[in-house]
Amino acid sequence: MAAIRFSCIDSAAAPLFDLSGDGGRTRTGFEPEAAQLVADELGRTLEWVIVPWDEMIPAVQRGDADGVWCGQGIIPSRQEQVDFTRPYAVFNESVLVRSGDPARAPEDLRGYRVAAITGSANMRLAETFPDVELVPFASSDDVFADMIEAVRSGTVDAMVDDDVVTVPLGDQPEFDLAFTAETRNPWGVGVAKDRPEVLEEIDGALARVIADGRLEEVWKKWMPHLPFPAEALRGGTS
């Protein structure tokens, strides 16, 4: 049986995934291990299609990958491009600043340059902050690392991303966690709209690994500091 192919970036964004040493063929972290559960459930090998962030959905639309499995918040702008499975994760969103920055609420960010990934749920949140300058990141091979470096260097004053990756960064001496917004952002696997059979296949496998507790085990292995969103996932909604 043919491999199942998921598109993603190759980046150091622990605990979601770490930078691969072989171009993305071998990956570690919550995202790759959760995807492996689905591949195993389907009896197929798993193949990663590594592309820049803004090429992940086009890769699926072209047929180069079967789905986008890479931090895809289920938001309207993406739902216009692909169909989504049930959620396999639910996260809040946090704002990261440099160490010593006094910002602790959205209104404290007035006049700040705030980075977020183009077209993401994080950018939608950043757009609600009053009087900030939005700095979109999208096209590089490692967009997450680029945003972190932009905060570190002072190119931007803050960045918005999901709490699963920003909260650990806030523990590093050069950064502070400004605040977390309780957005309950659901993540799913995006599949081309003209491949409903692939969507059904992946969604069914996800339902089974959620129902029998296998996904929860992987969650607790990689993200023990975050409670598993059992009710949201087992209900198939956010």
Regions found by a protein language model. Name each.
Residues T45-D108, E174-A181:
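Acidic, polar ligand-binding/catalytic clefts
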Residues T26-E41, G100, E107-R113, T118-A121, ...:
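Extended ligand-binding regions for polar small-molecule ligands
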Residues A3-T28, P106-R124, V132-V135:
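Short loop->beta-strand "edge-of-pocket" segments that line small-molecule binding or catalytic clefts
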Residues D10-S11, A89-V97, V167, D171-A207, ...:
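Periplasmic-binding protein-like
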Residues A121-D142, L177-A178, A207-S238:
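Ligand-binding clefts/hinges and TM-proximal coupling segments of bilobed small-molecule sensing domains
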Residues M1-G71, E80, S140, D212:
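Extracytoplasmic small-molecule ligand-binding "clamshell" domains
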Residues G43-T45, Q61-C70, Y112-R113, V151-D162:
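Alpha-to-beta junction loops
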Residues E47-P58, D101-P102, V135-A150, N185:
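Short helix-initiation/N-cap motifs at beta->coil->alpha
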